[in-house]
A protein has these predicted regions:
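Post-Walker A helix-loop "phosphate-sensing" segment adjacent to the P-loop in P-loop NTPases
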Residues: 110
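Gly/Pro-rich active-site capping loops and adjacent beta-alpha segments
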Residues: 147-177
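Conserved small/polar residues in nucleotide/adenosyl-binding loops
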Residues: 179-181
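Gly/Thr-rich phosphate-binding beta-strand-loop-beta motif of the actin/hexokinase/Hsp70
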Residues: 85-106, 148
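Phosphate/diphosphate-binding loops
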Residues: 102, 115-158
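Short flexible coil/turn linkers enriched for glycine and charged/polar residues
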Residues: 40, 58-61, 96-99, 133, ...
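Nucleotide/phosphate-binding catalytic cleft detector across ATP-hydrolyzing
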Residues: 1-88, 107
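Short glycine-aspartate micro-motif
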Residues: 66, 88-94, 139-141
Length: 181
């Protein structure tokens, strides 16, 4: 799974990959079957955490390499649209439900890393998460996303997160509930 030095990091990467492998494999098999039922028989391409695309057969071999695929795909889209606009230096921003991620793109290339952490116990404390040795687009993460709940804290200041509206009732933009207190 990882050919890099670092026994603990290699082990944690391998264990994480083994954990998600059967779930991911079943999901991809169901997805490919559903696409075939709709008459779509081309190879399904998936995005790796480093922004490259691979066939579903390749992705299933080491699914941990897709753990940050959504934000990586966003960064690659920013590179594409920046290039079409003649802009090579960009700041790509990806807002999810609980976190927002930013990526610096210089001269049409996102910054990359050979490893990163997931599931940090302390959101910004390096070393408090599970290290993964997989190539990835380097992202800066903040703990506030589109579903984060904002409130007035004890000092009268606005506090955002860590609570999230999740999908039910969902963010205010869903229009299902009002979050005014």
């Amino acid at each position: 799974v990882s050919a890099e030095m670092g026994e603990y990091e290699r082990s944690s990467t391998t264990v994480a990959d083994a954990y998600v492998h059967p779930i991911f494999k079943r999901y991809v098999q169901r997805l490919v079957a559903a696409l075939e039922d709709m008459g779509i028989t081309r190879d399904l391409l998936l995005v790796l955490s480093d922004g490259r695309t691979v066939t579903h057969d390749t992705a299933v071999q080491f699914p941990i390499r897709l753990v940050q695929s959504g934000p990586a795909a966003g960064a690659q889209a920013a590179v594409l649209y920046g290039g079409l606009s003649g802009v090579g230096d960009l700041l790509c921003f990806d807002m999810g439900g609980t976190t927002a991620k930013a990526c610096l793109i210089e001269e049409g290339e996102p910054q990359r890393s050979a490893s990163f952490e997931v599931a940090r116990v302390f959101r910004f404390a390096e070393g408090s998460g599970l290290p993964l040795q997989i190539p990835a687009i380097d992202m800066i993460e903040i703990g506030a996303g589109g579903g984060s709940i904002a409130r007035i804290g004890k000092l009268g200041l606005i506090q955002v997160g860590p609570d999230s509206a999740s999908s039910d009732p969902g963010p205010v933009c869903y229009g299902t509930v009002s979050y005014t207190h």
